[in-house]
Amino acid sequence: MQTYESDANIGNIKILAVDMDKTLLTDDRVLPQGLDERLDKLADAGIVFCPASGRPAPKLEEMFEGIKNRLAFCPDNGACVIYRGSYIYKSNIDVELYQQVLSRASKDPRAVPVLCCFDEFYVLARDHQYHDEISVYYNTINYVDSFEGIDFESNKISVFFPGYDAEPAFRETYSPEFSDKLYVTNAGREWIDFMNLGVDKGAGVAHLCEHLGIDIADAAAVGDTYNDIPMLERVGHSFIVDNAEEHMNAHAKWRIPSNNDGGVLTLIDAILAAR
């Protein structure tokens, strides 16, 4: 697979959408040193940097607190899009439909369901033991005895698998049962996410491009795993980190260094140098 240096039109990139976990973040789940000054340079050059993640908006904005109003965000796997502090797109799930998912996951001994309501999140009180793991991704967590009767505006249901068995659960249970009604995606060994059909990171990036009047051929995406495939296949410039799962080679054009080796920083430097 060719490296990023082979992208002859890298200087044409106007939007850079980047996955977070195992792509931008190191294995210790921290942002790479040297990112802040590069984000300033991208903004000054008129290039939109867009974290694209299964993480919700509050957590993403918290990670980029000092510069968030100069960025775009594609949280919740594209179920909403934010540009410079304002929502430009939301996709809410029908209450009856998300209750079906919550009911099924609540009966699964492997699963810890999370109802995502943009700024607040709901988890069963019985699952409070997993607070430390869940709070890595979700800020304001409300513990409830039951999901029954809840009808809040929601754009995503996430299911956490503390036994690291999300992949078989996705293949054997949740995708077969719900993929005709919702977009079901597997985000590594710990999480399965449910959004409306037609919602994914690729659609989120497309909404951002449309809002800004930018051709998606001039957008770039970087990822490492399954839920990054839609945006990698939709943009004009698709990159995977060197630590990406092997099957991802089929879904991107170019490779950059690993997350722990600052691959996204290397790509940003190359984009800026080519302008």
Features from the language model and the residues they span:
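N-terminal glycine-/serine-/threonine-rich phosphate-binding loop
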Residues: 5-45
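Mg2+-dependent phosphoryl-transfer enzymes with acidic/Ser/Thr/Gly-rich catalytic loops
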Residues: 6-15, 31-32, 193-275
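Active-site glycine-centered loops adjacent to acidic/histidine catalytic or metal-binding residues
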Residues: 19, 53, 224
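Active-site phosphate-binding/coordination module
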Residues: 28-130
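Hydrophobic packing residues within well-ordered alpha-helices of enzyme cores
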Residues: 60-64, 170, 174, 232, ...
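Short, structured coil segments at secondary-structure junctions
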Residues: 66-69, 77, 177-180, 234-235, ...
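Short, hinge-like loop/turn segments at secondary-structure boundaries
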Residues: 67-70, 90-93, 130-134, 201-203, ...
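Conserved acidic, metal-coordinating active-site core of Asp-based
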Residues: 104, 110-234, 243
